[in-house]
């Protein structure tokens, strides 16, 4: 049981280190969740689907790495040679350390390849586990050199015990695979390096017993041809130090990165490797200071040794100088945390199946998200009030669309020649608006506006209301021939005829054009229909219906304007010199005013339209009051009623400022019900006391005298009924 717990703890620490490297580690919940999936033997595709929410673009990279580790664990447990090995080399793929040492051994020179990921399991006998980092470089020959233990220049890595495992614990050794992209994660690779061979990185836990590293078969390691290939190595280690590994080459030595800056190391190396050593001295000093500033305890570190050579002497340098001094790579620090122990006894702990089920259901609910459609881009167009009639809306939209026309100066063909996407979009909107309105060609010609008129829009008050119009797709195109002179005059006439229907935005007053223009005010024109009540709107439009109803279906000007207005408009269009007189323009504005109806406004004196109301508002007092027979319909002023809205008199001759409620009509006289056909009406009713009277007795109304229905067929007594308390029987008290 302790072996499985230790293996699970090692896998979890490796997963946590990988998540920290990818920047996806937040708390302990994600590693726990991944361990649950490992325990459930989820496939790589299932893990990729479940972890995509947390890891994003790094999901595939993480799952490939995790399944590679699990595959190595399975191969180790099934391989008898790994079980017989006295000790293992433990490597960590993504949890670097600060303490490192370089061991030396036998190796051959092969084609360069990234070291494979190997996992081995054994039981170390000593409680004093040590961490060592070995980095090898391959040379051109297979000459073996013995390492002198007594030499003063010998570099031996000192390792401190990081933990003391139990004697029966399993130890996991993890080495980087090609999928780990360790070259991308280690940032200390110099760009101008001339050497194409990459060093191998090995992290090992050592003990007093020899350890065997387990590698993948050679067939699976020959994928890339520009990297190194490693052979299984036999490492023997002393109780306090590691046995040095021999490297091929002449006088080649690998120095521990953590001791490169010590004085005795510098004294022995600087004479031989001074041109290369001094280049990287500053970088190593900076890295040494960075490691000293670490606040959290460090588990392990990855060290990369880089070779340097000149352009013309690459082969000679490899043989003569051997391994060059490298610099420290970047490292990831992980605090060593004790294993979490449950605070509750096993009998009181929650069922693991329920926890796994809840986690799976939560994951399913998170992944099943709703895909909302993209919000379409919208466009706002200023328009007049929303309560216009359909003909008025058509007229306003035509003018608004033509006002935007000068900004879209080139037509469709010219836009395509220029290739301007913005102008194409605006031209498409204009054509779609015109095609949606379905305007006659003659009307379109008369409604064309010029740039000069577009600059004159500031003389009309602005309207802040607008409606939302979705951007339409390109539909049928309508090519409009510009006619600036007629468009200017048409717009002026339309502003006069429908000034109360069309409101545009304020613009800066531009330079005055040379052509004559008419400044028309809106004095005396009724308010827009949006400010009226429903009754007033019906009253106003009774006198404003167009005469020619058949032409109104064309949605043009003829269906909206009266014959007199059309006549004046045509005269203005035919006048080329602009000599349309102001007198005729005044006649035109007067002609559009509806005549007052000889009917008193029922909202007076609280009518909101004031003088613009088409109904009569009394001014002079009534001379026949109070004997006026017209009452509230009188065209003259009557005094105010003191009861106002509370007045219940239907024919009250006084004026009521507030709107009164429905007046109850007087209840008609109740007619006695007719006798039924099968019996005569009882002559003694309602005083008849005979219980078995064969004559007709009408039923009493349940509401009695409180009944308000004038056509009620039930009997209503004419005498008053005693109150309820008088009809209550009380038992008389008997004297004792």
Swiss-Prot record:
There is a cross-link at residues 99, 139, 175, 198, 245, 283, 295, 357, 378, 413, 489 (Glycyl lysine isopeptide (Lys-Gly) (interchain with G-Cter in SUMO2)). Residues 123-148 have a biased composition (Basic and acidic residues). The keyword NAD does not apply. The keyword Signal does not apply. The modification Phosphoserine is found at residues 85, 240, 309, 327, 343, 390, 409, 498, 515, 527, 620. GO terms for molecular function: mRNA 3'-UTR binding; poly(A) binding; pre-mRNA binding; zinc ion binding. It is found in: Nucleus speckle. A zinc finger (C3H1-type) spans 595-620, 621-640, 641-656, 682-699, 701-719. One of its GO terms (biological process) is spermatogenesis. Keywords: Acetylation, Differentiation, Isopeptide bond, Metal-binding, Nucleus, Phosphoprotein, Repeat, RNA-binding, Spermatogenesis, Ubl conjugation, Zinc, Zinc-finger. The modification N6-acetyllysine is found at residue 357. The modification N-acetylmethionine is found at residue 1. One of its GO terms (cellular component) is cytoplasm. Residues 77-103, 367-380 have a biased composition (Polar residues). Residues 77-153, 308-350, 367-386, 400-420 are annotated as: Disordered. It comes from the Eukaryota. Pfam families: zf-CCCH_2 (PF14608). Its main location: nucleus. RNA-binding protein involved in the biogenesis of circular RNAs (circRNAs), which are produced by back-splicing circularization of pre-mRNAs. Acts by binding to both exon-intron boundary and 3'-UTR of pre-mRNAs to promote circRNA biogenesis through dimerization and the association with the spliceosome. Required for spermatogenesis via involvement in circRNA biogenesis. Regulates the pre-mRNA processing of ATP5MC1; preventing its degradation. Also binds the poly(A) tail of mRNAs; controlling poly(A) length in neuronal cells. Belongs to the ZC3H14 family. Homodimer; facilitating circular RNAs (circRNAs) formation. Associates with the spliceosome. Interacts with HOOK2. Interacts with ZFC3H1 in a RNase-sensitive manner. This is Zinc finger CCCH domain-containing protein 14. It comes from Rattus norvegicus. The gene is Zc3h14.
């Amino acid at each position: 049981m302790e072996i499985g717990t230790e293996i699970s703890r090692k896998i979890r620490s490796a997963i946590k280190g990988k998540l920290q490297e990818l920047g996806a580690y937040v708390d302990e919940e994600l590693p726990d969740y991944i361990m649950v999936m490992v325990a459930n033997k989820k496939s790589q595709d299932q893990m990729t689907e479940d972890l995509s929410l947390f890891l994003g673009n790094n999901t595939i990279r993480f799952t490939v790495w995790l399944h590679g580790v699990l595959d190595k664990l399975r191969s180790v447990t099934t391989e008898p040679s790994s079980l017989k090995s006295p000790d293992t080399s433990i490597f960590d793929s993504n949890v670097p350390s600060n303490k490192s040492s370089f061991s030396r051994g036998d190796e051959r020179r092969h084609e360069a390849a990234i070291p494979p990921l190997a996992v081995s399991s054994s039981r170390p006998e000593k409680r004093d586990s040590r961490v060592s980092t070995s980095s090898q470089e391959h040379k051109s020959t297979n000459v073996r050199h013995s390492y002198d233990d007594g030499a003063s220049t010998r570099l031996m890595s000192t390792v401190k015990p990081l933990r003391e495992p139990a004697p029966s614990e399993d130890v996991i050794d993890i080495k980087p695979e090609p999928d780990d992209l360790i070259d991308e994660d280690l940032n200390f690779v110099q760009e101008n390096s001339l050497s194409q061979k990459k060093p191998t990185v090995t992290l090992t836990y050592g003990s007093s017993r020899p350890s065997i590293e387990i590698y993948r078969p050679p067939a699976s390691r020959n994928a890339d041809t520009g990297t190194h290939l490693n052979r299984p190595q036999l490492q023997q280690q002393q109780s306090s130090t590691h046995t040095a590994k021999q490297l091929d080459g002449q006088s080649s030595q690998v120095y521990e990165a953590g001791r490169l800056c010590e004085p005795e190391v510098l004294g022995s190396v600087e004479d031989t490797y001074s041109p290369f050593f001094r280049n990287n001295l500053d970088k190593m000093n900076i890295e040494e200071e960075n490691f000293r500033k670490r606040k959290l305890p460090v588990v392990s570190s990855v060290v990369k040794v880089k070779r340097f050579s000149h352009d013309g002497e690459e082969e000679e340098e490899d043989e003569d100088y051997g391994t060059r001094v490298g610099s420290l790579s970047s490292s990831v620090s992980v605090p060593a945390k004790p294993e979490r122990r449950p605070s509750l006894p096993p009998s009181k702990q929650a069922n693991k199946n329920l926890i796994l089920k809840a986690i799976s259901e939560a994951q399913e609910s998170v992944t099943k998200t709703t895909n909302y459609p993209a919000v379409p881009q919208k466009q706002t167009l200023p328009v007049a009030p929303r309560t216009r009639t359909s003909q008025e809306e058509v007229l306003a939209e035509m003018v608004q669309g033509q006002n935007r026309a000068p900004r879209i100066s080139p037509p469709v063909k010219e836009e395509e020649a220029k290739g301007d996407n913005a102008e194409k979009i605006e031209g498409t909107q204009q054509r779609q608006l015109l095609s949606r309105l379905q305007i006659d060609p003659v009307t379109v010609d008369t409604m064309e506006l010029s740039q000069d008129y577009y600059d004159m829009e500031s003389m009309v008050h602005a309207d802040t209301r607008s409606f939302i119009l979705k951007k339409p797709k390109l539909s049928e195109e309508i090519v409009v021939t510009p006619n600036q002179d007629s468009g200017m005059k048409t717009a002026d006439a339309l502003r006069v005829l429908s000034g109360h229907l069309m409101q545009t935005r304020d613009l800066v007053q531009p330079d005055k054009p040379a052509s004559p223009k008419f400044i028309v005010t809106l004095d005396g024109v009724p308010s827009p229909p949006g400010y009226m009540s429903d009754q007033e709107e019906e009253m106003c439009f009774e006198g404003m219906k167009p005469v020619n109803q058949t032409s109104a279906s064309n949605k043009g000007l003829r269906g909206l304007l009266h014959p007199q207005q059309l006549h004046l408009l045509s005269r203005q269009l035919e006048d080329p010199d602009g000599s349309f007189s102001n007198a005729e323009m005044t006649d035109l504005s007067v002609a559009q005013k509806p005549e007052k109806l000889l009917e008193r406004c029922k909202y007076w004196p609280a009518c909101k339209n004031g003088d613009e109301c088409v109904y009569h508002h009394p001014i002079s007092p009534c001379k026949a009051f109070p004997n006026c027979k017209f009452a509230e319909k009188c065209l003259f002023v009557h005094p105010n009623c003191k009861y106002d809205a509370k007045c219940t008199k239907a024919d009250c001759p006084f004026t009521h400022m507030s709107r009164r409620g429905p007046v109850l009509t007087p209840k008609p006289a109740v007619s006695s019900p007719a006798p039924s056909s099968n019996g005569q009406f009882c002559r003694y009713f309602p005083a008849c006391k005979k219980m078995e009277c064969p004559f007709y007795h009408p039923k009493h109304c349940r509401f009695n005298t409180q009944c308000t229905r004038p056509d009620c067929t039930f009997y209503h007594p004419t005498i008053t009924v005693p109150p309820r308390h008088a009809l209550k029987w009380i038992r008389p008290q008997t004297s004792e």
